[in-house]
């Protein structure tokens, strides 16, 4: 029997409607949640992501501002703008769209965002808080993946989980969240000799590498949950993930599609993080 789909669009819609209600209650108290988005340069993919984030804010009763800058913006000018947003009481979340042009130090920029407004969860203070089990913000993509696992009531305590990919944005925080939920976690990276040797024993596989068809049916334990974070293009230019969807679907118990899986959840959890920041600021 084919795996049950975990529909990211449907789950995102449900969480967004709850977020919109909470946002409306805050707005009534004079604390409308506000997200500031900064885009530097003309990267086409970044423009799409930013547009989707701003639209999600508008559709759910959040205030949003979008600062677009040319690719030759100086690092000093960007840091000055971030500092102004740090001081703005109407802004509860600050998001700098990555990647940034090469002459700008991304690490320095992310560290300039006030930790209480770092709704991406990338600031070193928030990364450290995640490590100790008391995060102010969970990074949006791993947070969305955890909500998807929660939606199918998958018992993570004692489960074996394998995260394929060790990035600071997805892989590492994903592993920490799974660990905190009681799973036994293995992280595979580009140096891992035989990824399949790890994934074949896993109850949960999270693929977050950016390499299409990396996870095939013979690498998946029957009945496992497979979360596909990858965003790639096939030979026809069609969106696909890191998982061979057609093959793995015949083996897994649950699987997320691409598109329509993790993607909508990432933006949804950005709204949730912004909302939580606004609620903390409102007291």
Curated annotation (Swiss-Prot):
Pathway of action: One-carbon metabolism; tetrahydrofolate interconversion
An MF annotation (GO) of this entry: methenyltetrahydrofolate cyclohydrolase activity
Disulfide cysteine pairs (residue numbers): none
SUPFAM superfamilies: Aminoacid dehydrogenase-like, N-terminal domain (SSF53223), NAD(P)-binding Rossmann-fold domains (SSF51735)
Catalytic activity: (6R)-5,10-methylene-5,6,7,8-tetrahydrofolate + NADP(+) = (6R)-5,10-methenyltetrahydrofolate + NADPH; (6R)-5,10-methenyltetrahydrofolate + H2O = (6R)-10-formyltetrahydrofolate + H(+)
Matching Gene3D superfamilies: Leucine Dehydrogenase, chain A, domain 1, NAD(P)-binding Rossmann-like Domain
Record key words, sorted: Amino-acid biosynthesis, Histidine biosynthesis, Hydrolase, Methionine biosynthesis, Multifunctional enzyme, NADP, One-carbon metabolism, Oxidoreductase, Purine biosynthesis
CDD domains associated with the record: NAD_bind_m-THF_DH_Cyclohyd
Assigned EC number: 1.5.1.5, 3.5.4.9
Residues binding NADP(+), per UniProt: 165-167, 190
A cellular component term, taken from the record's GO annotations: cytosol
A biological process from GO: purine nucleotide biosynthetic process
NCBIfam families given in the database record: PRK10792.1 (NF008058), PRK14186.1 (NF010783), PRK14189.1 (NF010786)
Function: Catalyzes the oxidation of 5,10-methylenetetrahydrofolate to 5,10-methenyltetrahydrofolate and then the hydrolysis of 5,10-methenyltetrahydrofolate to 10-formyltetrahydrofolate.
Subunit structure: Homodimer.
Family: Belongs to the tetrahydrofolate dehydrogenase/cyclohydrolase family.
PANTHER family, per the entry: C-1-TETRAHYDROFOLATE SYNTHASE, CYTOPLASMIC (PTHR48099:SF5), C-1-TETRAHYDROFOLATE SYNTHASE, CYTOPLASMIC-RELATED (PTHR48099)
HAMAP family: THF_DHG_CYH (MF_01576)
Protein's name according to its UniProt entry: Bifunctional protein FolD
Organism per entry: Cupriavidus necator (strain ATCC 17699 / DSM 428 / KCTC 22496 / NCIMB 10442 / H16 / Stanier 337)
Gene: folD
